Amino acid sequence: MSKEKFKRSKPHINVGTIGHVDHGKTTLTSAITTVLSKKYGGAACAFDQIDNAPEEKARGITINTSHVEYDTSIRHYAHVDCPGHADYIKNMITGAAQMDGAILVVAATDGPMPQTREHILLGRQVGVPYIVVFLNKCDMVDDEELLELVEMEVRDLLTQYDFPGDSTPIVRGSALKALEGDPQWEQKILDLSNYLDTYIPEPKRSIDQPFLLPIEDVFSISGRGTVVTGRIERGIIKVGEEVEIVGIKSTVKTICTGVEMFRKLLDEGRAGENVGVLLRGTKRDDIERGQVLAKPGTITPHIKFESEVYVLSKEEGGRHTPFFKGYRPQFYFRTTDVTGSVELPEDMEMVMPGDNVKMVITLIHPIAMSDGLRFAIREGGKTVGAGIVVKVLQ
């Protein structure tokens, strides 16, 4: 059976369901695929297909995630759903499933609950740009005033975490009734898909962003100069363009005099490609793995930042014991480890394996970074945590 060719006729958007346990995230995911497959084609996914989420590894961490896909008239969506609360936290912090927007599921019977708040906060920290709300189980609430109250609470909560609570679309629905084929509730799923289409803008593709290549290796080719290799993370590099080498040492400028891939010379390298970039007048010893090649002025080196971190539990192969302030592991950014020290929040004595925590990290060398960069925490090459840069400090 040959693999189906991926059709690129529609823009591709990544979304996911977030919200409190048992509020109906997986049922909604199933309902969306079912209702949209009737209208636009595609596969319907049953609840248990989605609930038995396969394990994946991201940055050395095992996460259970289900991926489904569906179409609207104008877009193709890839949608992620996680079975457990811990999987959500790991997913959002490691960026295993980057979201262009999220569907926050809140049961009208309960209103916002602790994990509702936690997922919104995490969404803010890790840069989920847009949230659309699905008020679920509305078939079980007869009282219009109660629904309005729950809606108001959700809007307040979103506003509290700097999302535009007042203008956020909220759909009142019942995932279960829609799944059972009740036309009145199926329409609510179509309303939701319409908001996904209109409220979540198309993301800027990585190729349209400023050029960045994390350096994996450096060679010197006699008679030609120095070549750095790596996978282009974003943007395009053209022969003759000026680039900066950023991180670890002082930033230097140089010119790209050649791009090659699979031993063939190219005029340019693009996001996603593994390339060698030839640099003018740069010595082999001036460059090392862990630096980045970037469009001048687009990224700067930093040593201190606020982060949101998930610490692996013992069962996940993490530490067996807690750590305290002054903990000094290695922080793995893109292609290299850098030692750094940890400051914990005032009220926190120690961090237990399995916790997620906000911490300030100070590195011994500067690394090219901006808000949203992901990293792993390692001890002697073993991953013990994962994190994201929330705010660069210096």
Swiss-Prot record:
Its main location: cytoplasm. GO terms for molecular function: GTP binding; GTPase activity; guanosine tetraphosphate binding; translation elongation factor activity. Residues 81-84 are annotated as: G3. Gene3D superfamilies: P-loop containing nucleotide triphosphate hydrolases, Translation factors. Signal peptide: none annotated. It is found in: Cytoplasm. It is an enzyme of class 3 (hydrolase). Residues 19-26 are annotated as: G1. Residues 174-176 are annotated as: G5. PROSITE patterns: G_TR_1, G_TR_2. Residues 136-139 are annotated as: G4. This is Elongation factor Tu. The gene is tuf.
